Amino acid sequence: MTRRVLLHVGAPKTGTSFVQDILFTHRATLLERGILYPADRHDAHFLAALDLMELPWGGLEREAGGAWDRLVDEVRAWPGTAIISHEILGTASRVQVARALESLGANEDTEIHIVYSARDLVRQIPAEWQENVKHRRAKEYGQFLDDLRDEQRSSQVAQWFWGVQEVPDVLDRWAESIPRDRVHLVTVPPPGSNPTLLWERFAALFGIDAQEFAPTDKANASLGVPESAMVRRLNERLNDVLPNHQYRTLVREMLVHRNLSGRPGSPRLSLPEDAYRWASDLGRSCVSELALRGYDVVGDLDDLVPGPAVPFADPDEYDEREVSEAAIDALAIMTNESARLRDAEAELRGEIKDLTAELERFRGTRTYRGKERLVAMSHTNPVARVGLAIYRRLRGKSSRST
């Protein structure tokens, strides 16, 4: 059987996390079907990507050492189809791409396929700024848009965005040595499409039954404009005082993902008129270029042509009353969480108190005092040392704590 690797390299905000959730959740069943998704933890492919590209990432890179090689070892030991998926791979340099492909056996008997999922820029740009905000960035939306439109792309924001979102460039780097029929471009359907259509496209490409592995959870809802403005300002207050691991737990997961996303009545973020025209022109140019390349398109290139403009609400100058309402909701959420944690802490303190009292009662027994004396004597008395050894053999390893 020919070893086959499907290498999904992005882009962010195109259903990648959603697909990875399905693959990770069903990895045991997929293995029975002959498809390997090699992961012992949900972020295994993320850590492997960090390792491959030697990216700093809030301290997580320290966990990533050797992760790429471990992933590759699993893939190369598997005789059938394997899937690797993480969106940050899209920004890999040509040198890093060459290392990745060579390590996976591209020059040997491995059939490597490059998978890239794309969405129109008019939706991608606002989504990327919101993702920045959720990762504790505090840059205003207007400045973010200016950075992206800078022809020099001198800012870190622009370099990252275009590194993972400029479709022709990403595929130039990843697919230069790959036959065109093994380069698969999955397009994200336009708004209003069947919500399962994107998954059906991925499933068809991966060779699995979309119905058997149908997602049960709804996709993550986006932050609205006032919520985005509020979280950005919150970042300004927290960035110098709150460690990354606490921000991930309290702000990104608990506050944003579980509570503020999808808050009713909030307008969704879009582009101002001039940025919309610019992004639309870029999108059409991109589609024209991709149409000439002969890649396998899973979907329709027209999906990458932006739809009509929607009304723009500026998060940098939004109605302060609405932002304040979002802030009050956030305060209520945090207060409830603080109360829950205090109750849990009080319960744990009570359990510790009970266990401490039980331990003290045990230490007061004649048996325990006798064992303590025997242990103390064994340091200087050979007979006591032999007696302790015999006692431990009779009682087993559990007595070694004495």
Role assignments for model-derived ranges:
Residues 1-402:
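Anion-recognition interface
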